[in-house]
Structures are given as structure tokens and as C-alpha cells.
Amino acid sequence: MIVHPSRENFSSAVNKGSDFRLKGEPLKHVLLVDDDVAMRHLIIEYLTIHAFKVTAVADSTQFTRVLSSATVDVVVVDLNLGREDGLEIVRNLAAKSDIPIIIISGDRLEETDKVVALELGASDFIAKPFSIREFLARIRVALRVRPNVVRSKDRRSFCFTDWTLNLRQRRLMSEAGGEVKLTAGEFNLLLAFLEKPRDVLSREQLLIASRVRDEEVYDRSIDVLILRLRRKLEADPSSPQLIKTARGAGYFFDADVQVSHGGTMAA
């Protein structure tokens, strides 16, 4: 496992690059999972120069150890990890965390793999060989997007059918089945629907609302998020009763929604 930079050598490294942090803001922590030693060192060196803390690991065991002991802001996963499948790391992390996940890969960026990874919870893709400047830009986008999904001061709760979405706690609860975990994109997309029930929302509107920013899969990204939400909300995702398609226009949420503002309920 490689951790970089240390507090002692960081100041000399940052002078070579650009630091966009606010005064007093801690270093953003990137956790990289890649068994390619040369790639790990390249990413560590470049991100260090640009004011990031980077922890690089080679397998899921080291990844889990770091994740359990440190605060991580972005995860970068190579799909090809020798004897391991990077998609399993994506699947396990997305099921329990909203940390943005960027996938890097050389020979597994077919459309099917992209769709599968999006369904599992990945946020972005970049193919090897890639521009290190583009890689840095994608990390910065992921960091700009993440604060928009945190609504800790919003005390509203949305109730529909037997579901309740609590914004402050970021929890989706079912009377029948308990809590259902949502990724950041799923949470934002569901909130967009609940704020405008029965209004048809275009893909562009949903893209903005859910903060999905992967140009390579622009149209498919919303469709994949819709599919994931249907699987979690609908009794029969193939015949949805809540999230419905408006042919040629977008999607709409077909249910009565009640909103509670910290105890006061409104339709």
C-alpha cells in the first residue's frame, strides 16, 4: 500500500501545481485501487502536485482496510485487478456509500460494461491510455458534484404509497421492507420526481437534477438510474406503476406525494 503525500513533504509538492482548496480546508483524499505499480506512482505523483492526498492499494483487502480507517472523498478503481474483478469493489462500495467512484480500464469499456458499472453505482469512466489532465478534471468534477447531494439541513420528508424519503437522514424507508439503500444519483433523481409529482421531466432536467456528468454515456446514464430506481421501488420493474415513461418527452412520477416540513404535513 502506498500513501502520499505526508504532511512534511506536501508543501514542496504543491508549489509545483495548483491548490484550489479554501484556506484551512483539509486535503481531499483519493483512494486508488490498481495493481499496476507504474500507474499508481504516476497518479500519486500528479495528484500530489495538485493538492490531493492519495492512498494507492493493489487489491480489495487493502481497499477495505483503508476505507474502514480513513475518510475518503473519491474512489478510483481499475476494472482489471489480476485475480480480482474491480466491478465487485464498485458493487460493494456503492451499496453502502455515496463516495463518487471513477472507473479506469484498458480493455473493458464496451457499452455493456459501462451499463453494468453504472447500474452498480459507478459515477464516471476513463479509458487507458488517458490524459492525466483529463483524469484530474474528472476527479475535480466528482468533488464538485458530491456536496450537492448532501442536504443535512433540509428537514423535509416525502411520503408516497408505503415509502418515506427522509432528506436530513438521507434514508428511504418502506413500511413493509425497512430501509433501502440509495446511491447519490438515485437519491437525487428520486427527489427530483418527488418534488414534481406527475410532471413530465425531460432527460436534460433529470440529468441536471441528479448531477450525472459522464458525457460518454449521456443519454444512457439517466435510463440506467431510472432502471435502478424502478428495481428498488417497483413491485414489478418491467411494468412500473410509479416511475413511468412519457414517450419522446421523458419520465414522470405517478403517485400522490405528501411532504412533511419537520412535523407539518402538506400535500
From Swiss-Prot:
Residues 29-143 form the Response regulatory domain. It comes from the Bacteria. Its main location: cytoplasm. The modification 4-aspartylphosphate is found at D78. It is found in: Cytoplasm. GO terms for cellular component: cytosol; protein-DNA complex. Keywords: Activator, Crown gall tumor, Cytoplasm, DNA-binding, Phosphoprotein, Plasmid, Transcription, Transcription regulation, Two-component regulatory system. Phosphorylated by wide host range (WHR) VirA protein. GO terms for biological process: regulation of DNA-templated transcription. Residues 155-255 bind DNA. InterPro entries: CheY-like_superfamily, OmpR/PhoB-type_DNA-bd, Sig_transdc_resp-reg_C-effctor, Sig_transdc_resp-reg_receiver, WalR-like, WH-like_DNA-bd_sf. GO terms for molecular function: phosphorelay response regulator activity; transcription cis-regulatory region binding. VirG is required for the positive regulation of at least two vir loci encoded by the Ti plasmid of A.tumefaciens. This is Regulatory protein VirG. It comes from Agrobacterium tumefaciens (strain 15955).
